[in-house]
């Protein structure tokens, strides 16, 4: 009853929420929030896109079928202005570009509540996003949260039934975000495993690249099922090394998110891997794609981190060799076939 009373008071005060990022996932999050809130902050770099949204109620680059009620949107390309506006900052900027955006900050993040919707590792620090804000900006872990799937932005745009896990060590904060994202087509649940869920969101992108490479090389569904089975076991070993706590790796935030990213036609990481399997170089595959494949950057950071931790990660090792050491995908998967079971 104490929790419910506290949450009720919290909801009455309606802390302000802002989304940072202009990509497909940021756009989907703004759509979800707009189902419940009368006012949402939205920061992105592009003045052109902001002006287009104001005039046409749509993001011209991502999920352009989604029509926004622009009277609900507080739009800005000034990151400091948006940080000052909001109590909750939902960060959905690709990890490769996050620090460049944060370098623009002149205002303090003290007292702000940060929820990461980024499925990647920050290259400059090799931290997951929550750790990065904690270590580099002194944000206490009680003010850090994670938004994870299984949930593709494209299906949010189509209003297909989707599921989100909202993780925070403070249940009131997790519930506040969960309630404001929930709708008839979005089901939400909360968790206190901020480290495990975020690492799972990072690792599943690497395994999706593996699934894509396998498909590009001509491996069928039978092998894909074995690959995904081995991927979830590898994920469990990796996460146990970085953060020991009791967790059910078969829950949707871990296994569910892995499966949708590994199998879906909407998965940019699987698409990236598929191109590698078909013979594209890493550089040409990245140039061909209009969206960032977070798994490319995550592979290097996860591989380096595991050199210290020593978990058994043959899939990550193979993908690292292909992406960063120029090893032949066909030969590397012939090796992988003999390792996994």
For each predicted feature, which ranges?
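NAD(P)+-binding Rossmann beta1-loop-alpha1 motif at the extreme N-terminus of oxidoreductases
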Residues: 7-66, 72-77
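NAD(P)-dependent Rossmann-like dehydrogenase/reductase catalytic/cofactor-binding core
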Residues: 7, 211-215, 240-341
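Rossmann-fold dinucleotide-binding core
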Residues: 121-220
